[in-house]
């Protein structure tokens, strides 16, 4: 199947029919394709990806607030991070067979671009942005609710709650890799107390910057405490990558 073929099948899986299929086409154009075809007067999907990230975050936040009105900001942020991450976006992209529709350069194709998690996740965000531009907010909310149904149906809320069982370090790593393409590092700040009753203070560092600190009776507990604080800081938009 050619990448440009089968768009009707993709629209059927999405449960959405484009009024302007040009927007759908643009969502599938990777920059590598245009680099190798400079004569084409087209745009790649990177700006759509930027918009799609914001649209998806808004939609999931909206649905979680509806679903769990009694949850506090920290709990909602943890749920959103458990849902909106590269792993889950890639899973949905694979279910849509999205990789087969992408327009890639030959080099990207040869290195397995159609199966790359980051590329698939980014392309899904671009696809959601194209739906938003084509049909508006209500249209994209409907598609996102369909695609993320396993998390968002009330009777299936245990799937979302199960995500809360993830340790904070795992959640933080997934979030920072998805948002910043970086992996957090944990550094011992200091130890206090006698050998039989030590308290460890750990810092979580991102790109050379201390993001947060935490304490515990073991290094592992201190790392978890630091990761929890880091998640809260990122959720509150109180940190930026300089």
From Swiss-Prot:
Catalytic activity: Endonucleolytic cleavage to 5'-phosphomonoester
Protein location: Cytoplasm
InterPro entries linked to this entry: dsRBD_dom, RNase_III, RNase_III_dom, RNase_III_sf
Top-level taxon of the source organism: Bacteria
Residues annotated as catalytic: 53, 125
Homology family: Belongs to the ribonuclease III family.
This protein's name: Ribonuclease 3
